[in-house]
Amino acid sequence: MTGRLVQYGRHRQRRSYARISEVLELPNLIEIQTSSYQWFLDEGLREMFREISPIEDFSGNLSLEFIDYSLGEPKYTVEEAKERDVTYAAPLRVKVRLINKETGEVKEQDVFMGDFPLMTETGTFIINGAERVIVSQLVRSPSVYYSDKVDKNGKRGYSATVIPNRGAWLEYETDAKDVVYVRIDRTRKLPVTVLLRALGFSSDQEIIDLLGDNEYLRNTLEKDNTDSTEKALIEIYERLRPGEPPTLENAKNLLASRFFDPKRYDLASVGRYKINKKLHIKNRLFNQRLAETIIDPETKEVIAEAGAMIDRRTLNRLLPYLEKGVGLQTYRPAEGVVDGDISVQTIKIYAPNDPDGEKVINVIGNGFIAEDVKHITPADIIASISYFFNLLHGVGDTDDIDHLGNRRLRSVGELLQNQFRIGLSRMERVVRERMSIQDTNTITPQQLINIRPVIAAIKEFFGSSQLSQFMDQTNPLAELTHKRRLSALGPGGLTRERAGFEVRDVHYSHYGRMCPIETPEGPNIGLINSLSTYAKVNKFGFIETPYRRVDPETGRVTDQIDYLTADEEDNYVVAQANVPLAEDGTFLEENVVARFRGENIVVKRDRVDYMDVSPKQVVSAATACIPFLENDDSNRALMGANMQRQAVPLLEPEAPIVGTGMEYVSAKDSGAAVICKHRGIVERVEAKEIWVRRLIEVDGKEVKGDLDKYRLLKFVRSNQGTCYNQRPIVKKGDIVEKGEILADGPSMDKGELALGRNVLVAFMTWDGYNYEDAIIMSERLVKEDVYTSIHIEEYEAESRDTKLGPEEITRDIPNVGEDALKNLDERGIVRIGAEVKDGDLLVGKVTPKGMTELTAEERLLHAIFGEKAREVRDTSLRVPHGGGGIVLDVKVFNREDGDELPPGVNQLVRVYIVQKRKISEGDKMAGRHGNKGVISRILPEEDMPFLPDGTPIDIMLNPLGVPSRMNIGQVFELHLGMAAKKLGLHIASPVFDGATEEDVWNILEEAGLARDAKTVLYDGRTGEPFDNRVSVGIMYMIKLAHMVDDKLHARSTGPYSLVTQQPLGGKAQFGGQRFGEMEVWALEAYGAAYTLQEILTVKSDDVVGRVKTYEAIVKGENIPEPGVPESFKVLIKELQSLGMDVTILTSDEQEVNMENFDDDDDHAPDAIMVDVKPAEREEAGEEKDAVTKE
């Protein structure tokens, strides 16, 4: 098969090697963000107001109701919000009604409830000018879970937990003596019968009648020392509130509020759904033997005989009757916690693990509890206890906590709703208090409501929650992946330290829901995942994946798509996407490879229920961009997927010759491109904007409508300092459809994702320069700017009010020559377009110095003649080390001009410096298969090996990097790329359905290349051919964000730590290089005594010595003797602080006075130690404040 041509967007055709026709289009890839937030605005907010409304005061006289809400227009647009460092938000107004029940007076008011952050069209939020993403969280679903474990004696014990969304936990467990215990809210355990008595089943006989007679229950009753409901309630109260005097009334109220009060206990709709599903009677009846005859209550007809086995058919016959309420029993408990009847559904069966088959057990379901009952009910508790006893008798299943049917997603909407709930409940408290304090006649809703707690809760969530993250904006793919990320960490989730191996592991239920490949390396592995390409999230927060329905009558695979959750999928047999089908959609082969509950099985074709939609439904968007993924080892594929996210946008991006067909969709949905919103005709194309005149249909004719103007981003700094720039790809007069790409974003080429460049690669060694994965590169790639990228850095200077007077931004700076001021304008701010080097002035700023107290005469003179002698010091903003470049833009914000600035700031200046970074030695590069390396040598073109036609190679990679890493995909890509380049084609080779080995050999033949894809190479230095033929081809290589310019660092003097007086560490602190323990050993081994002494004293923490040494070097004198290092003094002081009498003695046993060493400090010249202000001091967590400023 030679593949067929497929169109991607307006401008690109690719030859696709896909064999499987896809029935389903890819969904919008950031739908998980946008639809969740939309739900919150439409439903979530309304739910919250309904939950707390009405608020009544303690006497029940005043009542405050929330009727409706509306969101106004945002104050700033997205662009303005970014520029002004404000939040992109809209005002939330709520219609509130206050009712005075005594007078019958009703007051209605619209109350402003704060600005609510809005989501941009691309699924992000702008908070204080920074673009942030709310990551979805994977948590345990509220439900009831049963688990078993074998103890040290080999006895199987069971435990169960009822987990609510919020509220007290209820746990059951067995011990070695077969007694069943319950724990309420993590307290000490009680026999489970105590809880049943508290619910109103006071005597032993009632409990036995309810649950059925069995030895576990008998053991528990023996252990139980209460014999009535009152005693049970008191017992529970003493456990939950130790030390308080128990009364019956208090005990009842406590239990009622813990479990049966909707405000204190919430299962959420998902918890109710899961509990009803788990405790329903039907799952436990399947494959069991009935111990009673089941009769239709209306017709008295026998549906199932006692002793009959319940198979699938009998169960299906029973189901309608079970739903009607066969076996429903209503208990009227005496004086329990709850008033009213308890209805449960009971059916008797024979215990399957009884050797005689005579023992009868009760199977109890929780009756029929409506979906909107969000708290737990007594029926739930009884049914969950019954399930526990059933498990002991071999009926029912334990749960796998890592199964995706038991884990759910909290997306943006729900996370926000939870925060909003916290804010509202705090506000509710305030409202109640104000109701009782203020005068009831004159009060208005506005006076009652304090919106501060609501605003604070929302602000706190967006500003400091673990799940609200600064968007990774290195390139469009990084952006897209960040929005589709699923994290198991965060509040209410796991912690890195506690998470075991099982949670992190790939589970069979991840198939089509979560990517098994894309996850970070390191401590977060498996805790942070990525959503698969086709996955969707249902209303309960479970991830669903699409399957094609197989028609059971005809055996044909239909085009009907069903989205299944993980626990629904467990009931079906699912065939792989690559199963061969006939023309009419039936399976060609009698036996089909399929999956059932994590087992890969071969089944007869009539047993298949569903079929995969596409081979790439298993993996995430980033993984689906790796061609020949099927030929790579998964560990390397993981690195490949992660490194694509670190690709720096290049000056001239180029789409991969060998792609997967995902490039177009990923780029389009990422939010980096400009997408057309309505069908229309392009009227005008400029670098900065595109005008599209809408075409609308009126009476069957197309007429011109409104004009849409699309603004393009030009050289904007992204969150990561890369350059975001958009370029139009449409022409004037083009007719564009809705959803078409009008302009490429960064790392895009003709609407496709283009993270790197296609270069000519040879797998060969060259003088050992590609040892350990190093890369040798041709100088052509430097000269022709193939791997040149643009980086923009932002620097800020602000003038504040200080105690001694305001700071001033000015050109007039003390002790600075005219030469240093040449690039500053009259305001003292650098001009746009100036070329600046490290240490140059960007913004001139002076701060008033502290002055001595003036005498009365001096003060009088000052008042008359004005302040002449004001002492100021230079606090200008300078270019930090490695930050030189060209000034791209300057933004000035003034308080006088009405700009919103933080308190105490009068003026804020932002300077943007742009750098053009060519590729250089030390930069990190990678392919898409996890084949990464650092450039070790850039050779002149003439020294590079060349092909027989004289073309020099661009890059040489080490062939030893392939076999042990098992990422053979790169070799396929190399050969296929070579052939495609020759034929002038672009190729799409989708994951798991791409070009085969045979296809690659065929296209090589078609391109007229050698069948083994190797070629003779000639040495550029000598012109001689190399001994063996070499694999040469086109590979897609990307430049990663780890650039040598950001890592190179040197220091002579700089800041020192306060306590030890040693230099700080790290580039961000402008620190020194650590000469560690092992390095000291090395010098000791060489006997290099003077070097060693110097390193341990004057170069490190001998305070006096280092000043004197600096002086000596400057004056050209001999370097003096070192003194005592500060760390030694610290050690002595620490020993003395432990109460030890430690003194230092000289060689002739004279005591050395430590104080003498400090005397010299006073004479140390001030100006010697240079204080360097690091640009990113905030990022340095280590010793942030511990800097001595000399």
UniProtKB/Swiss-Prot annotation:
Gene3D superfamilies: 2.40.50.100, 2.40.50.150, 3.90.1100.10, DNA-directed RNA polymerase, beta subunit, external 1 domain, DNA-directed RNA polymerase, subunit 2, domain 6, RNA polymerase alpha subunit dimerisation domain, RNA polymerase Rpb2, domain 2. The keyword Transferase applies. Residues 1173-1190 have a biased composition (Basic and acidic residues). One of its GO terms (molecular function) is ribonucleoside binding. It comes from the Bacteria. The keyword Nucleotidyltransferase applies. One of its GO terms (biological process) is DNA-templated transcription. The RNAP catalytic core consists of 2 alpha, 1 beta, 1 beta' and 1 omega subunit. When a sigma factor is associated with the core the holoenzyme is formed, which can initiate transcription. Belongs to the RNA polymerase beta chain family. This is DNA-directed RNA polymerase subunit beta. It comes from Geobacillus kaustophilus (strain HTA426). The lineage of its organism: Bacteria, Bacillati, Bacillota, Bacilli, Bacillales.
